[in-house]
Each structure stands twice: as C-alpha cells, then as structure tokens.
Amino acid sequence: MKFQILLFFLGRMIKSKAKSDPEYKKKLAEKNCTVQIKTADNKKGRYYTFTNGEMTTAKGVAAKSDVAIVWQDAKIAFETLKKGNQKATMQCIQNGQLKLEGDGGVALWFMDKAKQAR
C-alpha cells in the first residue's frame, strides 16, 4: 500500500510543479511517452503518460509503455524510493531487485523530471 501511495503522490508532485513552473512544463513537453512503474508480479503499479507537456496518470499496468521500471516487490521499491538517493537505486539494479524494460533514455528523462518535481 505504501508503494502505491508513493506513486500516486509522485504524479501529484509532477502535476503541481508543471502548474506552478512554466519552464518545468516546457521540459515535460520534450517527450510524448508512457512510463510504467510496477512490481515484477504486475500486482502493483502506476503509469504516467506525457503528451505535449500534459501528464495523465492511472493506477495499474498500462497496455503499452515506452519504458517499465520494474521492482522485485513493493516493499523493496518503497524502502529504496523513500531513501531518495541514487546509490540505493544502483544497489537494487546490481542485486537484480530493479530492472528497466524498454527505452532507457525515457527512464532517465522521467527520473530527472521526478527529481525536479520535489
């Protein structure tokens, strides 16, 4: 549940930042894409769709995404994301607890925009 709440609030932060910061909104318009964040068993997740600088988000697994950020399970995802540091994330990748499926460039773009939204 904590993982899903964190993903929900990530979407709220991105929307809020875009509403209050015209430069940030321009950066969101750089890509039209769908980013999926989910658990490996597909039981928990959320996706974010960016179209011409606007973002929509929904709970669940998207039918199609440009990149999927796949966590081994919700507990590992929440604990790692809560730390908010790149070292912890890289450790999860090295341990096989986090995988990217699809366009890594889109994943990096999304992670940068998520970080800027804080």
Where in this protein do the model-derived segments appear?
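Feature captures hydrophobic
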Residues: 1-118
